[in-house]
């Protein structure tokens, strides 16, 4: 059923416009989000929005597909295939207090045969679609992400694409950002969605910055997946975040100031084959990673990939990224995140330091209560499921006895007999200030 139909008025984009109002800002609240595939799910949108809200997330991220919005040149309308996503963006802020990300995703057969928007007509058309979308969701959607994983060819018809030159993506950012800000000056525009942990990702980012990308966007989105890395340290939350710290240092060097970063996708699969990890390991990973990200002022949010498993094949990586099982029962990851959700949403970071022997110390406060978090860095921690990435017993630093992976331990300051766990287990102690 057609919900809305509107003839487009072409947006004439003047590339000489001054961008004094589109600047990097540093005051956004930390968002805790989850990626969704609302078009694929069996229930109506409120079922999932309520789940997300109840589990302690204040944002979700989903695709708003250009090809489903503009199916006749110059005509923008929603159709049944995207109703659930469209309605979610329209109601999630008012009904659930959420700040969603709308991903302005992928190509359109009307212009570039479903590949990259790489010619002038396609880029202008993409900007028109971005304008229509931002106007439709003004006051309802806070974040707009320009494309998704341009470097990887995600969403294109060609499964092994060669991305167009960096200048093409820059031009797309330039025109789409102008269009979005014209429709809604308060919109937060982000772009990138690449992996900064690999050298070619950083080079691509640096090239975009040198072209002037930061004059058009409010922050850079990244997807720092590392579960396939041969560098064991990058497979740990500490090593992953430290690499992002290095990337931020490079951004400061190029931009002369701190640049907001949005981790719009990150996840670890619980598949049983190669590159899959145990559910307990993933639960601890999510706890540590979220706390570490929260401690960085330049990281403005984390959106975990994803809400629920996408398929039934336990050996398929893409089927096992969910924090929930496909039947919506909770994995340990969701159970563990629920235990820190209030801390993430309502506490602010007061102190972060690492001792010379690798002990991580974080202090959070909500003005009345204080939360102290500690664990010992372990860059060699194992959590793989497959025979090629075999799970190894964890050892305590004292007696080297095998230890089960524990996601986290929550203590009261008055507790006299804390449980015995591995030194790399995060321990959270709450006390009154």
Regions found by a protein language model. Name each.
Residues 28-132, 138, 145, 151-157, ...:
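N-terminal substrate-binding region of glycoside hydrolase catalytic domains
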Residues 288-382:
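Aromatic- and carboxylate-lined catalytic core of secreted/periplasmic carbohydrate-active enzymes
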Residues 60, 133, 144, 176, ...:
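Conserved, mostly hydrophobic/aromatic
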Residues 2-14:
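Bacterial N-terminal signal peptides that target proteins for export
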